[in-house]
């Protein structure tokens, strides 16, 4: 039993789970932005479309994590139909390490982007013509989530299985 917990296959699946943790950041970020959006829409229902756009921005981290988790599962044969391939501890650890950037950065950047989006939503509440500025503030945080996605993708593709 203990041997199966410390196998390459286990580490690879733990890596896929780690990548999927980016969804936590997205869930919190979208929730924070949603709270701000509800306040603005309660004052002016016509601003719903503008604030919904800003509320959706923190959701991308979860998508990035899901993408890397799927790529891990495809790489190890879990989604290919032939069954999971045997992995060495080094291969499993490499896959786990490759999943860390998108998972960890996704958690923190999703929350930070939610706060930036909430501030942008409040800006739109007072000055609807400033939507682009509010989006830019939130998009600045997105840069780091995209960089983490790129790092995870490149690391994952460098591992030979």
List the predicted regions and their residue ranges:
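Hydrophobic, small-residue-rich transmembrane alpha-helices and their short perimembrane loops
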Residues: 1-161
């Amino acid at each position: 039993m203990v041997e199966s917990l410390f196998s390459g296959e286990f580490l690879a699946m733990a890596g896929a789970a780690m990548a999927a943790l980016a969804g936590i950041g997205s869930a919190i970020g979208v929730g924070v932005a949603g709270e701000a959006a509800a306040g603005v829409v309660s004052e002016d229902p016509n601003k719903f479309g503008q604030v919904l756009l800003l509320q959706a921005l923190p959701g991308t981290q979860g998508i990035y994590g899901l993408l890397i988790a799927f790529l891990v599962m495809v790489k190890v044969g879990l989604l290919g139909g032939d069954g999971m391939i045997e992995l060495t501890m080094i291969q499993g650890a490499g896959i786990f390490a490759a999943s860390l950037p998108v998972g960890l950065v996704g958690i923190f950047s999703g929350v930070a982007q939610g706060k930036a989006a909430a501030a942008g939503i409040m800006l739109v509440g007072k000055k609807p013509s400033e939507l682009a500025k509010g989006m830019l503030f939130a998009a600045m945080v997105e840069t780091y989530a995209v960089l983490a996605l790129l790092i995870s993708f490149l690391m994952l593709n460098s591992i030979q299985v």
